[in-house]
Amino acid sequence: MSLPYRDFYYPLNVFMHILTHEEGAVRYLHYGLFERPDDSIDAAQERSTELLLSRLPPPPARLLDVGVGLGTTLARLTRLGYDAEGITPDEKQAAMARGRVTVAPFETFDGGPYDVLLFQESSQYIDSDALFARARALAPRVLVLDEFAIEPGIMHTYDDFLHAAAENGFRVAEEIDLSMKAAPTVDYFRARLPRYRQALIADLGLTDQQVDHLIANGEIYSNYYYSGALVYRLLDLTR
């Protein structure tokens, strides 16, 4: 069995480890969208990608996948006939993606033009003002699937994100709240972390304290979602 999590970084290597041993493989790093409690995590993650793909113009539109993850979505876009490229500041992600991937921060990326920019859980790592200032120069459309905080202090806030978009000439063409479909992803890992404690320590070199921290954070994140402090949304922004 290939064990790619051994070459990845914390904490994503933890989630990759659990997916590999629970599901037999890991294709995605993003949240799943659960329709039923008995959905598999793989089916839920695939549903998330399908939702994103359903909003795209037909091939051969030119797309930039910002973040790339493991490269699964980028490879699929290429197979579908899109002129698709990826960008990530992380060399390990780029190596795993093995596609047309530039290793660079999005904020200074000088490429394009593109028809659509895709942010599948990558917008949260980029300052919102910088994101839309750069997006304005690259494409007329930004498609986002990500989590947001409602109040400041957890991560980028939804209001600040929309304000930055508007300041750079983007308007919301579509918005879908998927929070309750995404939340079971947190519960999936939260339920399995205690079971994999010793394996994570042995395989990844984690400490008991790190595993305890992940378990505690899982509880906090679950509460954030079910209390409405965190939301998960699809946003289609155009200018």
How should each PLM-predicted stretch be described?
Residues D42-P59:
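Conserved alpha-helix/loop element of class I SAM-dependent methyltransferases that forms part
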Residues L64, V68-E107:
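Class I SAM-dependent methyltransferase SAM/SAH-binding core
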Residues L118:
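A conserved beta-strand element that flanks and buttresses the S-adenosyl-L-methionine
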Residues P140-E151:
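Conserved beta-strand signature within the Rossmann-like core of class I S-adenosyl-L-methionine
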Residues M1-T20:
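N-terminal auxiliary segments of SAM/dcSAM-dependent transferases
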